[in-house]
Amino acid sequence: MKIMIIQGPNVNMLGVREVGIYGAMKMEEIHEQMKLAASQNNVELDFFQSNFEGEIVDKIQECLGTVDGIIINAAGYTHTSVAIRDAIAAVALPTIEVHISNVYRREEFRQKNLIAPVCSGTIVGFGPFGYHLALMGIIQICEQIKNLRAMQQAQQTNK
């Protein structure tokens, strides 16, 4: 199983930017923790970070046929990007959205979420641990899809 982790604008500044909101853990440290959990679950991870909307859209599109699922922190683009929303919908892969802070306890503009309606699930407010929760969730969803496809194939074979 292969999962793409997509990090949006300013996520590369974790550990430096607004530590009181996002914590002291750097993006690279989050990725290392995810790699450890993935290796324990026989999952391969790829990581991508960009501050540019078009690059994120391109990366989502590249996921089609190459990965089993996506974990995305679209960061500020969560509230503004129809393009990222449409890319997620277009590839139709299991996708879990992550936000380190609880966006629903913050400024009103952060409570508008264009991404969530096209995602399998959303995890907010658990700090860096939210990435672990997202990883466990995407593994579960991908396993269910794999088992369903195997069952459907078996039924086709028995006809």
Curated annotation (Swiss-Prot):
GO molecular-function terms, A-Z: 3-dehydroquinate dehydratase activity
InterPro entries from the UniProt entry: DHquinase_II, DHquinase_II_CS, DHquinase_II_sf
Residues annotated to bind substrate: 73, 79, 86, 100-101, 110
Keywords per UniProt: Amino-acid biosynthesis, Aromatic amino acid biosynthesis, Lyase
Site feature (Transition state stabilizer) residues: 17
Keyword DNA-binding: no
Catalysed reactions, semicolon-separated: 3-dehydroquinate = 3-dehydroshikimate + H2O
Pathway where it operates: Metabolic intermediate biosynthesis; chorismate biosynthesis; chorismate from D-erythrose 4-phosphate and phosphoenolpyruvate: step 3/7
GO BP, sorted A to Z: amino acid biosynthetic process; aromatic amino acid family biosynthetic process; chorismate biosynthetic process; quinate catabolic process
Signal peptide: none
Active site annotation, chain numbering: 22, 99
Family according to the record: Belongs to the type-II 3-dehydroquinase family.
Function: Catalyzes a trans-dehydration via an enolate intermediate.
Quaternary context: Homododecamer.
Protein name as annotated: 3-dehydroquinate dehydratase
Biological source species: Campylobacter jejuni subsp. doylei (strain ATCC BAA-1458 / RM4099 / 269.97)
